[in-house]
């Protein structure tokens, strides 16, 4: 069977359809600009960024034990006045990726929008750099300084001298200065309690965070929203927070966790007194 040959007019029409369309000047300009942008986003997505990923960490009851040894031990002639406290004083932490760990843009974006995770600037968590040994040494040095300040602040608050009360502090696997306030509260609870034969907590689980100076001033710390989640997870109903960080704490405040702002050790003790006695308690 013979088939007719395609006409020249049909071929010309097909050729016209098959010829690529020419891009306009505007389209070519957009294409030229888009190529480096796409390449830039591709590089950014896989390049390591100076962030760490953090989540709620452990809590530790400073009135209890850490690895089978008391966190706080007191002795001396002025150390036997306190009664037993059946509540808890929980210091709180965050858990972060180690210094120098590779963190990429997709991880930062994902953690930025989660309420139970956070992406934080690396320098805010590891101010001395990304060498693990240096970071660990720095954190342990800060912990020792914090403990020394906590002892001085507690003794000053109780008007006792180191000759009257000898204090030993031990908290395994935790570094940094943010447990200072709770070390001081724990020392006072173990030495004099509430001054009426009871403990400071009134049987509650009280959590919190904050640095401490020898004069009793409470300072801000990092990661408060994550620490409030750790506190709620471990049974706390009250969270003592440095007043300067009330706004941060309220952003992701867990339901049922009462935020109590503090500026000094004396103020923290007054707030705990008010909680026990049903008095007026400050609030964020």
Give each language-model segment a name.
Residues 2-284:
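Peripheral, non-AAA+ core regions of ATP-driven protein-machinery
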